[in-house]
UniProtKB/Swiss-Prot annotation:
UniProt keywords, alphabetically: DNA-binding, Isomerase, Magnesium, Metal-binding, Repeat, Topoisomerase, Zinc, Zinc-finger
Name of this chain's protein: DNA topoisomerase 1
Complex formation: Monomer.
The EC number(s) this enzyme carries: 5.6.2.1
Purpose: Releases the supercoiling and torsional tension of DNA, which is introduced during the DNA replication and transcription, by transiently cleaving and rejoining one strand of the DNA duplex. Introduces a single-strand break via transesterification at a target site in duplex DNA. The scissile phosphodiester is attacked by the catalytic tyrosine of the enzyme, resulting in the formation of a DNA-(5'-phosphotyrosyl)-enzyme intermediate and the expulsion of a 3'-OH DNA strand. The free DNA strand then undergoes passage around the unbroken strand, thus removing DNA supercoils.
Zinc finger map (C4-type): 589-621, 649-676, 699-724
Interaction with DNA: region residues: 186-191
Binding site residues for Mg(2+): E9, D105
Gene name as annotated: topA
CDD domains referenced in this protein's UniProt entry, alphabetically: TOP1Ac
Molecular functions (GO terms): DNA binding; DNA topoisomerase type I (single strand cut, ATP-independent) activity; zinc ion binding
Record-linked SUPFAM superfamilies: Prokaryotic type I DNA topoisomerase, Zinc beta-ribbon
InterPro entries listed in its UniProt record: TOP1_Znf, Topo_IA, Topo_IA_2, Topo_IA_AS, Topo_IA_cen, Topo_IA_cen_sub1, Topo_IA_cen_sub2, Topo_IA_cen_sub3
Length: 853
């Protein structure tokens, strides 16, 4: 018993840390969380005693949630599926060592993982040590092991309080939403406020009424034939504003014979400070804007960079930089850019209103490493972005000259503003300056200019823009909703739930999301109240700081939520939650001649036969008609705007959503549906911008027709055969995806993290191995070529070429199957010690071509 056990969350992190620790340390990974709250699915039914006593509703709910709010928040945990082997191994090693170092991440989640590991491993509590570090470097690791501590239980309590609240809301409100609105719905303490941001913006956009106005620019010439362009800004000392073409023509008549004299010119020198080093939220925004990465992808790549020791810890909202980091970056700037770019003192940035962590900002672990090798190309781009912001944050400000020139023509004032960059400063690294070195002619005050051209411009006011991932993150941060470390999870959840649709990287609220938020505003106002959500985050932070008792906070939240829940369960006429009713229409059902009604579900808006609910189960008519939303068609902004302008509900005067029923019929539905039953039908011949929307294709499995559908993950075709239900996705370019093969069992290839075996699946990023017990075990990996070659007889014909690929590179490293997203092509690459070697092979002209980087 001379060695010590060190436990971290990820295998990559374990591998990196083991390089800096001596042989007396055994470094192992827990592969993330090992325990979670128990639920019905995770209970071992063999251990549940049979009873004739029917559980009452409260008891059943407690069993489902795994927590008991009526008994001082007693919680029941279970080992996560697939983690049994890992826990068994950790326990075995723990019994043979003197000390156990819990080196999980330094945030609340990491603290909770450390506590769960301690509880699961058990044994003498004096053996456990807590070590934390902000970066995975030799110096940082050595310092951490010289300053060992204990698990911070206040941080654990804060994480548990957040987890318990989320579990309460999710488990207690979902049955109500399923009953009152639609199956598959859920609400969340933070996610519902995020959905409200998108639905409120959707409402603003749809009800926006544009206003026309005009501005006039003038092209002027000096006697030396020097040309300048200026805007009319004032008329009789009032802001110049024209509302229509008539006013424009009148103004042109007034100014075309006037004299234009320069009356003022002001030159000022300004400085533009560099942006702060990146924190979690600004990393997500910058990555989305500059690199086009989703928030989820950004956090995934950043986590890998941290675990490999390239950057500091990624979950932080502090702009603080250590003295060591500042000293190194200032030295780098002076050596590589010169002393002109180095400020006399380091740049200091103040933290934000809701800042809670005392960590450093995100920065490179070693500023001398400008580019990294043996990494995913996207990870390299993200590292370079982080490096650029870090360097720029400690450089001198950009200096530029602002030139403001004023010209008078009788009662008209004209102005122009020009910026000339004098010193690039930090923009040498981050080229974010929009300043243009346009030199305004040096003309003296009193100079007379000659009118050359009159340039009128028609302008329309614009509605607020739709949220992108970056702007949604910025708004969440601004309102204090959630924490930056949770933004990726929030956005992923609301995407998966079908509360929004994404078109050209912009968020469109789905109808079911609008209905959900309308109902929550009335019956669960706290869940969608921005200020309440922000205050709760602040309270959870105070739990970490031991300023608030976590159970008192939970009791207060639970009491209030329970009262709202009981009220919402009542009938609508007694103040309960409104139902998601079907709105009758005059459209006849093609199967039973009853009328069709407008129905909204998670899958979208559609027409459903009213005979479905009016008849006994065996006689129900299940006929439905899919409605194709205007937003799902490739219409122009002008077309979309015109639809909303021209069609308003005759019952409530709100705008109407437009759907295509078929090539000869459109339906306009009030945006307040189903609360308002207003709708209009329009007959005609309608051209489709989305060419495949009404296209008929045959199912490759059963040869029946496939119909266009709209779902929470986008548009697709679905087989009309109920026993088949085959689907084909519609790609962003409008094309229909190629048919995918059925999962192929590989019982001889076993999983590493669970007692099961792999199946070969085909996804949007090519083929991959996945555990056959998915979703119980979510283990996945890329297939080795030698595995495909060994079991070639199991593969469909279209994959046989992969089995013929080189099984090893020129240095003997095994090759795996990869996917090029740009070219939508499978290729072969090799790895050594978990990193790509740069060797690759592509299948071109029916043969494998090897590429060495």
């Amino acid at each position: 018993m001379c060695k010590s056990l060190v436990i971290v969350e990820s295998p990559v992190k374990a591998k990196t840390i083991s390089k800096y620790l001596g042989k007396q340390y055994i470094v192992k990974s827990s592969v993330g969380h090992v325990r979670d709250l128990i639920n019905n699915k995770s209970k071992n039914k063999k251990n549940i005693k049979k009873s004739n006593i029917k559980h009452n509703e409260k008891t059943a709910l407690i069993q489902q949630m795994g927590i008991n709010p009526y008994k001082n928040w007693k919680a029941e945990y279970h080992i996560l599926p697939g983690k049994e082997k890992i826990i068994s191994e950790l326990k075995n090693i723990a019994n043979k060592v003197h000390y156990i170092y819990l080196a999980t991440d330094l945030d609340r989640e990491g603290e909770a993982i450390a506590w769960h590991l301690k509880e699961v491993i058990g044994g003498n509590s004096l053996k456990f040590r807590r070590v934390v570090f902000n970066e995975i470097t030799k110096k940082s690791i050595e310092k951490a092991f010289q300053n060992i501590g204990k698990i911070n239980m206040n941080r654990v309590y804060s994480q548990q309080a957040r987890r318990f609240m989320d579990r309460i809301v999710g488990y207690m409100i979902s049955p109500l939403l399923w009953k009152k609105i639609s199956r598959g719905l859920s609400a969340g303490r933070v996610q519902s406020a995020a959905v409200r941001l998108i639905t409120d913006r959707e409402y603003e956009i749809k009800n926006f009424i544009e206003r026309e106005h005009w501005k006039i620019s003038l092209s002027l010439l000096s006697k030396e034939n020097k040309k300048v362009t200026m805007d009319i800004t004032h008329y009789r000392n009032k802001t110049f504003l024209l509302n229509n073409k008539k006013e424009v023509n009148s103004t042109i008549e007034k100014i075309k014979n006037l004299s234009f004299i320069i009356t003022d010119r002001k030159d000022k020198i300004f400085k533009k400070k560099p942006p702060a080093p990146l924190i979690t939220s600004t990393l997500q925004q910058a990555s989305n804007i500059d690199l086009g990465f989703s928030v989820k992808k950004t956090m995934f790549l950043a986590q890998k960079l941290y675990e490999q020791g390239y950057i500091t810890y990624i979950r932080t909202d502090s702009y603080f930089l250590s003295n060591y980091a500042i000293e190194k970056v200032r030295s780098y700037i002076e050596n590589f850019y010169g002393s002109d770019f180095l400020p006399k003192k380091s740049n200091i940035y103040s933290n934000q209103k809701y800042s809670q962590e005392a960590h450093e900002a995100i920065r490179p672990s070693d500023v001398q490493v400008v580019n990294i090798d043996n990494c995913d190309p996207d990870a390299k781009k993200l590292y370079k972005l982080i490096w650029n912001y870090f360097i720029a944050s400690q450089m001198k400000s950009e200096r530029y000259k602002s030139i403001k020139t004023t010209v008078m023509a009788d009662v008209f004032k004209l102005q122009s503003n020009t910026k000339i960059v004098l010193f690039s400063g930090w923009t040498k690294i981050l080229k974010k300056s929009n300043n243009v070195n346009f030199k305004f002619p040096v003309l003296d005050i009193g100079t007379t200019l000659i009118l050359d051209k009159i340039l009128p411009h028609q302008i329309f006011t614009k509605p607020p823009p739709r949220f992108s991932e970056s702007s949604l993150v910025r708004e969440l941060e601004k309102k204090g909703i959630g924490r930056p470390s949770t933004y990726a999870t929030i956005i992923t959840k609301i995407k998966e739930k079908g509360y929004l649709k994404i078109k050209k990287n912009k968020f469109y609220a789905a109808k079911i999301g609008e209905i959900l938020i309308t109902r929550l505003k009335k019956n669960f106002s706290d869940l969608v109240d921005y200020d309440f959500t922000a205050r709760m985050e602040k309270n959870l932070d105070q739990v970490s700081d031991k300023l608030i008792n976590w159970k008192h906070l939970l009791n207060s939240f639970f009491d209030n939520f329970s009262q709202q829940l009981e009220q919402a369960k009542k009938p609508p006429e007694e103040g309960g939650m409104e139902l998601n009713t079907t709105v009758p229409t005059e459209i006849d059902c093609s199967l039973c001649n009853k009328k069709m009604g407008i129905k909204t579900a998670v899958t979208g808006v559609f027409l459903s036969c009213l005979g479905y609910n009016s008849e006994p189960n065996e006689k129900r008519c299940k006929n439905t008609i899919n409605l194709i939303s205007l937003n799902d068609l490739s219409t122009t902004k002008k077309e979309e705007k015109n639809f909303h302008l021209k069609n308003r509900c005759k019952k409530c005067n709100l705008v109407m959503d437009v759907y295509l029923i078929n090539e000869n019929l459109k339906i306009f539905i009030c945006i307040n549906n189903p609360s308002c039953n207003g709708y209009n039908l329009k007959k005609g011949i309608f051209k489709k911008s989305l060419n495949c929307s009404l296209k008929k294709i045959k199912c490759e499995k059963c040869k029946n027709d496939m119909l266009f559908k709209t779902g929470r993950f986008g548009n697709f075709f679905m087989c009309i055969n109920d026993t088949c239900k085959n689907t084909r996705k519609i790609l962003p370019n409008g094309e229909i995806s190629e048919p995918k093969f059925e999962p192929i069992p590989f019982p001889d290839i076993l999983c590493e993290k669970s007692n099961t075996w792999f199946v070969l699946r085909e996804g949007i990023s090519g083929i991959f191995f996945a555990a056959n017990t998915f979703p119980k075990s979510r283990e996945t990996r890329s297939p080795f070529v030698e595995e495909l070659a060994r079991f070639e007889y199991l593969l469909p014909k279209k994959l046989h070429y992969l089995a013929s690929a080189p099984q090893r590179d020129n240095k003997g490293n095994k090759t795996i199957v990869c996917f090029n997203k740009l070219n939508k092509q499978q290729y072969i690459a090799s790895k050594k010690e978990g990193k790509f070697t740069g060797w690759a092979a592509f299948f071109i002209d029916r043969k494998w071509c090897i590429v060495n980087k």
